[in-house]
């Protein structure tokens, strides 16, 4: 394993690396050592023996990658990607080299130790996945890459002007060319320079000061998604039918909560104080609070019947599970709108503006903008989080790169019921945003609608590296799933769930009507037999459950004496209706002979004859092709 590695070390102070450079010079695995510096003239001839200096603009630019590619001659490149004090572990280089060779990986990275405030702590990394396309993936500062692949990237990107995203673009390229391999061994020690809490770091990507960086990153991830066959074309989006189901309430504010006695009253009162030109309610799902949260909710409910207090029967629900409980409740409105139990709406028009945006944008999901503030509503950096990087054309693609989509989030309830939240307490909203954006538009409101209060009780205020890794691993898993789903969709594979308004209407009816659900289930017991008649095949069905309707007397006297079961006043309370035009309604037939069986009655009490209505029926088949029996 002699002289297999060329080292490229980012350096802003040579003294920080002198000891490590001396050890590298004595390693039999090292061929060349190159120090990357912003201004080689500053160091003059005062740099360690056996090294060369390379002047670069930034270790992350495409120009730097090209210079490294032109200089490297060894089989592998060891790249220190940031200026930091570094100590490579005993035999770590030999281990990296062996793993790189055995795995045949395009790139290898490892766990490391971190010096934080003078204290040595473990800093494990996580495995790289197909969905690890976010630009802030934590590889640590030391990576090993196959030299021929870096050179191939340089040849294919000779004209790239990426000033900030060159290293990110290289990584995406490497993931297409081979495996990015995580060696979960602690192989080196670096000094951590960013000691901010996780709750502060997580908003770096929306800081306006980083706008140029983010533009480049978006360009790179867009090209990557196109090359792997996962780029969404938003011109192919579906348009939601907001009238596909009847709702008693237009909108519902959903507040999942557990042990927030200090903030829940403010959140509920913020929701109930909304001024809107429609009926709305508030569903609080109290996930078995052990403090006074439940008492506070119940006290408010006694005074305002718009507040619905739900306590789950289950004890295994996360935030996503609490959301599912709320949206599947019959009292949930047409649009379900988020409000966290820590937070507030900025004004009394938030709900109205969100519902207006649904109808204006013909979107299935709406996301607003929020301001970071402390408990007393004083603004905290970076202030307004408006996700102005989002565009209608490319937002759904760039969403795979960033860590969040914004707040408040609102959903068209029938679609939300079809998809359902994952039962987690982290990333559940992000998962829904990705899935919605695969086929439907996400509308944005770039004005402030929401106050995100940061305080010591926030669940994400200051997380351990283990918790950060668990969160990042999960979101990367969501991205992996979404990229796979988009690749399959773009190849023509149909979704596991039929995504049409009529089938959602049908499924909701069967879910909420026990007798009808039983009869549809019993269709599996129906016996059929085929008969040939000339050139036609006839199918006979033996369906005992159908005898109730088919065996009923239909003589004139019996019909006159029997209430018309098609008239709305005589229908079962459980039966939904869908108005399809000014003459006809659509009902789910509770005595089916087909797996999906609709009835189309006239709104007027009159003989239900197809004669004279053929043109109308053909128009309905054009508007609702799901009605066709094939």
Where are these regions (language model features)?
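A conserved acidic beta->alpha catalytic loop
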Residues: 37-45, 85, 286-296, 315
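Conserved donor NDP-sugar-binding/catalytic core segment of glycosyltransferases
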Residues: 90-122, 349-382
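Acidic donor-binding loop at a coil-to-helix junction in glycosyltransferase catalytic cores
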Residues: 160-170, 425-432
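Short, acidic, metal-binding catalytic loop of nucleotide-sugar glycosyltransferases
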Residues: 20-31, 269-279
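Short, flexible, basic/aromatic active-site loop/helix in glycosyltransferases
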Residues: 117-141, 369, 382-402
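Glycine-rich, basic loop-to-helix element that forms the pyrophosphate-binding segment
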Residues: 57-71, 313-331
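Active-site microenvironments that recognize anionic phosphate/pyrophosphate groups
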Residues: 495-607, 612, 627
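A conserved hydrophobic helix/loop-capping motif in glycosyltransferases and polysaccharide synthases
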Residues: 4-16, 27, 36, 251-263, ...
């Amino acid at each position: 394993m002699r002289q297999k590695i060329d080292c490229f070390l980012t350096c802003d102070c040579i003294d920080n690396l002198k000891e490590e450079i001396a050890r590298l010079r004595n390693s039999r695995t090292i061929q060349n050592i190159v120090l990357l510096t912003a201004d080689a003239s500053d160091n003059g001839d005062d740099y360690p023996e056996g090294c060369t200096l390379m002047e670069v603009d930034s270790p992350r630019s495409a120009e730097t990658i090209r210079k490294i590619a032109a200089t490297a001659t060894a089989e592998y490149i060891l790249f220190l990607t940031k200026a930091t004090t570094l100590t490579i572990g005993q035999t770590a280089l030999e281990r990296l080299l062996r793993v790189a060779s055995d795995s045949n990986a395009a790139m290898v990275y490892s766990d490391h130790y971190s010096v934080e405030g003078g204290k040595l702590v473990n800093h494990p990394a996580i495995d790289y996945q197909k969905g690890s396309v976010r630009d802030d993936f934590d590889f640590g500062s030391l990576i090993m890459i196959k030299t021929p692949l870096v050179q191939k990237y340089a040849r294919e990107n000779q004209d790239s002007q990426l000033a900030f995203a060159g290293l990110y673009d290289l990584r995406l390229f490497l993931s297409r060319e081979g495996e990015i391999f995580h060696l979960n061994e602690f192989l080196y020690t670096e000094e951590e320079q960013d000691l901010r809490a996780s709750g502060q770091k997580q908003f770096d990507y929306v800081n306006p000061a980083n706008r140029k960086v983010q533009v480049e990153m978006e360009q790179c991830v867009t090209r990557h998604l196109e090359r792997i066959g996962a780029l969404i074309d938003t011109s192919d989006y579906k348009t939601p039918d907001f009238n596909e189901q009847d709702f008693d309430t237009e909108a519902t504010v959903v507040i999942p909560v557990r042990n927030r006695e200090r903030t829940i009253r403010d959140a509920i009162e913020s929701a109930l104080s909304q001024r809107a030109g429609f009926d709305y309610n508030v569903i609080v799902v109290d996930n078995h609070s052990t403090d006074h949260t439940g008492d506070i909710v119940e006290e408010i409910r006694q005074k305002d019947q718009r507040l619905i207090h739900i306590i789950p029967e289950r004890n295994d629900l996360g935030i996503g599970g609490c959301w599912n409980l709320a949206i599947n409740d019959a009292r949930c409105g047409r649009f379900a709108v988020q409000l966290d139990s820590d937070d507030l709406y900025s004004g009394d028009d938030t709900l109205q503006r969100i519902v207006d945006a649904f109808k204006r944008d013909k979107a299935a999901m709406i996301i607003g903008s929020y301001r970071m503030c402390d408990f007393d509503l004083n603004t905290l950096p970076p202030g307004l989080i408006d996700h102005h990087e989002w565009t209608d054309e490319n937002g759904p693609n760039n969403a795979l790169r960033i860590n969040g989509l914004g707040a408040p989030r609102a959903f068209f309830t029938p679609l939300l019921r079809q998809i359902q939240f994952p039962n987690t307490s982290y990333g559940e909203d992000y998962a829904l945003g990705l899935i919605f954006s695969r086929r439907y538009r996400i509308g944005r409101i770039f004005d402030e609608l929401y106050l995100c209060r940061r305080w010591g009780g926030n669940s994400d205020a200051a997380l351990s590296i283990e918790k950060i890794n668990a969160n990042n691993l999960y979101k990367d898993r969501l991205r992996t799933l979404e990229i796979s789903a988009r690749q399959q969709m773009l190849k023509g594979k149909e979704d596991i769930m039929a995504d049409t308004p009529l089938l959602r209407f049908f499924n909701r009816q069967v879910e909420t009507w026990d007798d009808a659900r039983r009869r549809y289930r019993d269709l599996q017991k129906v016996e059929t037999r085929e008969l040939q008649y000339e050139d036609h095949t006839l199918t006979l069905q033996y369906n005992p459950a159908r005898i109730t309707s088919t065996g009923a007397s239909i003589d004139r006297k019996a019909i006159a004496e029997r209430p018309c079961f098609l008239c709305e006043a005589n229908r079962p309370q459980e039966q939904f209706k869908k108005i399809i035009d000014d003459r006809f309604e659509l009902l789910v037939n509770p005595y089916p002979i087909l797996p999906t069986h609709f009835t189309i009655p006239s709104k007027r009490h009159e003989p239900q004859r197809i004669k004279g209505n053929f043109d109308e029926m053909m128009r309905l088949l054009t508007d609702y092709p799901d009605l066709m029996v094939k």
